[in-house]
């Protein structure tokens, strides 16, 4: 982004402020000044001349001119330029002049005729060819002005008309300050820094009620990518008014190549000032209906605006010749759009151009700049006296409406910044930035300028306060080391133990990217996390939002390894998932693909299976001291397509969702060329919450334990966990129990029952149990089962 001093002086009184001070100001505010150019030092003795006579010299390419260079003062100038014409105002270098290209002028005799100067093109006096048209690179430049009487300016220095002696600042904008692609935003910043009043010499133009109409349809291909669609109609007059040369120079100083069409140049000016790109169309050349769609051109898909089957505009470029606004145009249709930045960055790459429009379409600007934009466009047209009338802006699509009101306490600001700052000082920092501050006790409520799409939270406000306060004014404080009692971080200790266990079990710890695409995030939202964090300006569609699960990243890593020849893997990852409103959850995900256990020496090869992955989960629960008698596994009948419809379960603890355990769908495995894969993902925050944090060390009996086995029939509809407490109540010596077998035959299957065998362990701390004591407890179990109407085999 380039701003010039003379343009700033339209809005600010810079009479007591040097260029060096402006540069320091911009750098202090976080806008890095990459380059400064002082055009006033590039040339000397350049004046405005009027070509009154032009005669070709026979047999040569030369033309002999009589050029007025002052009141009753003339010079004979010979030139080979192809565009020498009478009654034109040109840039004349007089003898003794020094030009930016290194040339020093002196009188020169050619064919016996003394040439007393030279007509200049812009590339001879300091402008690069990159901002000049092909004609401008070869021809003499002719001066037009809508502000000055050119006859009266003959003999004066060119800068009195062209503003060529300007001083430019090329500013590098960070992505979060894309709002400064509207030059007016930098005016606010500089005014605020120097405590200057902004002079808004805006032309007061009355906006009429809409009398003309047009329909702008959105094709399904683009409707999700469009944020704003606005338009208006402008009546024109005096359309043959030439484009002012001072405006032309300002565009060139701003690194913008002027177009042959002056209306496109005026649109570029308004875009540089407001940030809003414009599509200008001759309203009489469209049939009352436009369509925004996508079309493949030269094998590249581009977003275009069409009238019927004809392309009116390829977004980022100027209007097609057939629909351009020209000097014959009576009514101009102005279309203003804002689209998804990722789509427009793709458009910019496909077009392989960087224009005033593409630079702004592809950045996260305020989507509702149309009012500011049309004010600037209308203001410039009014300066040219080309404005007949203008209708009120009609907005047909307006999707985005950012929340721009945030509150923070003074204490919070002081705590974050580490400075003693008062409410009055904070308010004084935002004098001209269109950020309103109201105060209630010690709470400050900020109503943020809607152009500042980078400010959307308390931390951003604190950073903004620090920026305006001045980073150099925040005194550096050495770190203060305070001794304190070492805290017991149970969560960290458990995670460390968990990591050690999984590594010991042969798992590799992986770290994957926290950002993912929106669609897969919706698909894999197993924990039903609400309000995902979507980036304002992501680098790509694959990195649009913070993930709400670890499973998708785990599966992608397994697929990547399989494609690179590593098909048998065991991975785990511990990471946090995020959402808006401060949501943060710590998850563990582990997965096995191919062989779960491999021992080449003993020829043991065990493929991944549900029993293995569930045993790892049970070990994790045991590490967290979770009471597994309250843990249940429920099949999810509505699993996503990527998950096996039957081999999957939601793991719950007293109806609280701990996590998920599942096998991938065989079709998905086959499509991605991976071996059978089993995944488990759990919520570590919940495990910590339900963990038994009070550990009681039990005395170990020195006496020999005794065991008994019992088998009984149980309906398949009854969960063993629901009867075990009643079955084992009122026992004196039971120390442990374990289900060791489950059996059913054909007849039992018909009756929907199974036989469970449970091993019971008995012992005592103070004596060796007698057979009678063991039998008494066992008899109680039999009676309990009888009460439960359970048949013992």
UniProtKB/Swiss-Prot annotation:
Its main location: cytoplasm. The keyword Ligase applies. Residues 401-476 form the B5 domain. It catalyses: tRNA(Phe) + L-phenylalanine + ATP = L-phenylalanyl-tRNA(Phe) + AMP + diphosphate + H(+). Keywords: Aminoacyl-tRNA synthetase, ATP-binding, Cytoplasm, Ligase, Magnesium, Metal-binding, Nucleotide-binding, Protein biosynthesis, RNA-binding, tRNA-binding. GO terms for cellular component: phenylalanine-tRNA ligase complex. Residues 701-793 form the FDX-ACB domain. Residues 40-159 form the tRNA-binding domain. One of its GO terms (biological process) is phenylalanyl-tRNA aminoacylation. InterPro entries: aa-tRNA-synth_II/BPL/LPL (IPR045864), B3/B4_tRNA-bd (IPR005146), DNA-bd_dom_put_sf (IPR009061), Fdx_antiC-bd (IPR005121), Fdx_antiC-bd_sf (IPR036690), NA-bd_OB-fold (IPR012340), Phe-tRNA-ligase_IIc_bsu (IPR045060), Phe-tRNA-ligase_IIc_bsu_bact (IPR004532). Its EC number is 6.1.1.20. It comes from the Bacteria. GO terms for molecular function: ATP binding; magnesium ion binding; phenylalanine-tRNA ligase activity; tRNA binding. Coiled coil: none annotated. The keyword Ligase applies. Belongs to the phenylalanyl-tRNA synthetase beta subunit family. Type 1 subfamily. Tetramer of two alpha and two beta subunits. HAMAP family: Phe_tRNA_synth_beta1. This is Phenylalanine--tRNA ligase beta subunit. The lineage of its organism: Bacteria, Bacillati, Mycoplasmatota, Mollicutes, Entomoplasmatales.
């Amino acid at each position: 982004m380039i701003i010039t001093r003379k343009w700033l002086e339209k809005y600010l009184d810079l009479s007591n402020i040097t260029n060096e001070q402006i540069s320091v100001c911009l750098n202090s505010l976080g806008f890095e000044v990459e380059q400064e150019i002082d055009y006033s030092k590039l040339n000397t003795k350049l004046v405005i001349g009027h070509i009154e006579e032009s005669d070709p010299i026979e047999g040569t390419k030369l033309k002999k001119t009589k050029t007025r260079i002052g009141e009753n003062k003339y010079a004979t100038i010979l030139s080979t330029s192809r565009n020498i014409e009478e009654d034109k105002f040109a840039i004349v270098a007089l003898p003794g002049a020094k030009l930016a290209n290194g040339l020093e002028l002196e009188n020169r005799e050619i064919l016996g005729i003394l040439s007393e100067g030279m007509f200049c093109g812009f590339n001879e006096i300091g402008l690069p060819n990159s901002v000049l048209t092909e004609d401008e690179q070869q021809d003499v430049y002719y001066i037009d002005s809508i502000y000055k009487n050119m006859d009266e300016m003959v003999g004066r220095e060119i800068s009195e008309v062209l503003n060529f002696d300007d001083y430019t600042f090329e500013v590098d904008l960070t992505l979060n300050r894309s709002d400064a692609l509207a030059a007016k935003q930098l005016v606010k910043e500089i005014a605020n820094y120097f405590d200057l009043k902004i002079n808004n010499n805006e032309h007061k133009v009355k906006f009429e009620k809409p009398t003309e109409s047009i329909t702008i349809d959105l094709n399904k291909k683009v409707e999700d990518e469009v944020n704003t669609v606005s338009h208006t109609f402008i009546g024109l007059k005096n359309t043959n008014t030439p484009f002012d040369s001072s405006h032309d120079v300002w565009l060139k100083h701003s690194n913008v190549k002027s177009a042959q069409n002056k209306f496109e140049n005026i649109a570029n000016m308004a875009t540089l000032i407001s940030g809003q790109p414009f599509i200008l169309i001759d309203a009489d050349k469209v049939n009352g209906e436009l369509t925004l769609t996508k079309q493949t051109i030269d094998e590249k898909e581009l977003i275009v605006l069409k009238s019927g089957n004809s392309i009116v505009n390829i977004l980022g470029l100027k209007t097609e010749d057939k629909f351009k606004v020209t000097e014959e145009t009576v009514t101009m249709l102005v279309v203003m759009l804002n689209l998804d930045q990722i789509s427009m960055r793709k458009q910019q790459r496909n077009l392989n151009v960087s224009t005033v429009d593409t630079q702004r379409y592809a950045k996260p600007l305020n989507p509702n700049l149309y009012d500011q934009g049309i004010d600037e466009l209308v203001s410039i047209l009014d300066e040219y006296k080309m404005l007949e009338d203008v209708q009120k802006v009609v907005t047909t699509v307006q999707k985005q409406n950012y929340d721009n009101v945030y509150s923070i306490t003074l204490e919070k600001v002081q705590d974050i910044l580490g400075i003693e700052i008062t409410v009055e000082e904070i308010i004084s920092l935002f004098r001209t930035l269109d950020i309103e501050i109201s105060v209630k006790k010690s709470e400050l409520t900020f109503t943020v300028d809607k152009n500042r799409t980078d400010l959307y939270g308390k931390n951003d406000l604190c950073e903004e306060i620090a920026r305006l306060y001045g980073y150099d004014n925040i005194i550096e404080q050495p770190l203060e080391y305070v001794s304190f009692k070492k805290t017991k971080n149970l969560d960290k200790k458990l995670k460390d133990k968990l990591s050690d266990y999984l590594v010991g079990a042969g798992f590799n710890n992986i770290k994957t990217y926290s950002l993912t695409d929106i669609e897969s995030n919706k698909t894999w939202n197993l924990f039903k996390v609400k309000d995902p964090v979507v980036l304002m300006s992501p680098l790509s569609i694959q990195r649009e939002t913070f993930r709400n699960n670890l499973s998708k990243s785990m599966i992608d890593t397994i697929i990547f390894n399989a494609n690179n020849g590593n098909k048998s893997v065991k991975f785990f990852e511990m990471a946090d998932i995020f959402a808006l409103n401060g949501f943060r959850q710590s998850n563990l995900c582990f997965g096995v693909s191919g062989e779960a256990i491999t021992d080449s020496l003993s020829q043991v090869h065990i493929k991944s299976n549900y029993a293995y992955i569930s045993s790892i989960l049970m070990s994790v629960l045991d590490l967290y001291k979770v009471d597994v008698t309250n843990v249940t596994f429920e099949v999810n009948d509505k699993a996503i397509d990527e998950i096996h419809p039957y081999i999957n379960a939601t793991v719950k603890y007293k109806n609280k969702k701990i996590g998920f355990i599942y096998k991938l769908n065989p079709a998905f495995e086959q499509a991605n060329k991976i071996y059978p894969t089993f995944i488990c993902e759990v919520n570590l925050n919940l495990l910590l919450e339900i963990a038994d944090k009070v550990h009681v060390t039990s005395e170990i009996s020195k006496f020999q334990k005794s065991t008994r086995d019992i088998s009984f029939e149980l309906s398949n509809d009854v969960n063993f966990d629901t009867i075990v407490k009643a079955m084992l109540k009122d026992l004196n010596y039971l120390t442990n129990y374990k289900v060791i077998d489950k059996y059913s035959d054909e007849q039992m299957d018909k009756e929907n029952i199974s036989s469970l065998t449970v091993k019971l362990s008995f012992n005592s701390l103070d004596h060796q149990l007698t057979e009678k004591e063991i039998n008494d407890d066992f008899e109680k179990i039999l009676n309990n089962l009888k009460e439960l109407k359970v048949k013992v085999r």
